[in-house]
Amino acid sequence: MNEIGLGHFLSVAAVLFTLGTLGIFLNRKNVIIILMSIELMLLAVNINLVAFSIYLNDIVGQVFALLVLTVAAAEAAIGLAVLVVFFRNRGTIAVQDINLMKG
């Protein structure tokens, strides 16, 4: 029976990270797609952290992955809240319109 090794985890993480990067570079008009691509990249990083944690028999990578998941959830919630407020004020969430915001 074949065992799933470190190389398999790293390959899946590399594909996910590449898809997230392509999602950011190829779609610059929709902010929600950009946020989803960033979350996909963070998921790939978490897979790497957990894979190396298991491979090295150390729990620090898994703890750090939980920390990254917590921060990513907070980042997504704040980002979506800002988008909802912006959509209510402007009626659009296009990236070129967001560049007009002044603080």
Swiss-Prot record:
Q: What Pfam families does this protein map onto?
A: Oxidored_q2 (PF00420)
Compartments, as annotated in UniProt: Cell inner membrane
Give UniProt keywords alphabetically: Cell inner membrane, Cell membrane, Membrane, NAD, Quinone, Translocase, Transmembrane, Transmembrane helix, Transport, Ubiquinone
GO molecular function terms noted in the UniProt entry:
NADH:ubiquinone reductase (non-electrogenic) activity; quinone binding
As recorded in UniProt, its EC number(s) are 7.1.1.-
Topological type in the membrane: Multi-pass membrane protein
Please give the biological process terms from Gene Ontology that the record holds.
Answer: ATP synthesis coupled electron transport
The UniProt entry's sequence similarity note says: Belongs to the complex I subunit 4L family.
Q: List the PANTHER family hit by this protein, alphabetically.
A: NADH DEHYDROGENASE SUBUNIT 4L-RELATED (PTHR11434:SF21), NADH-UBIQUINONE OXIDOREDUCTASE SUBUNIT ND4L (PTHR11434)
| Functional description taken from the UniProt entry | NDH-1 shuttles electrons from NADH, via FMN and iron-sulfur (Fe-S) centers, to quinones in the respiratory chain. The immediate electron acceptor for the enzyme in this species is believed to be ubiquinone. Couples the redox reaction to proton translocation (for every two electrons transferred, four hydrogen ions are translocated across the cytoplasmic membrane), and thus conserves the redox energy in a proton gradient.
Tell me, how does this one assemble?
Answer: NDH-1 is composed of 14 different subunits. Subunits NuoA, H, J, K, L, M, N constitute the membrane sector of the complex.
Q: Write down what this protein is called.
A: NADH-quinone oxidoreductase subunit K 1
> What is the protein's species of origin?
Rhodopseudomonas palustris (strain ATCC BAA-98 / CGA009)
Gene from which the chain derives: nuoK1
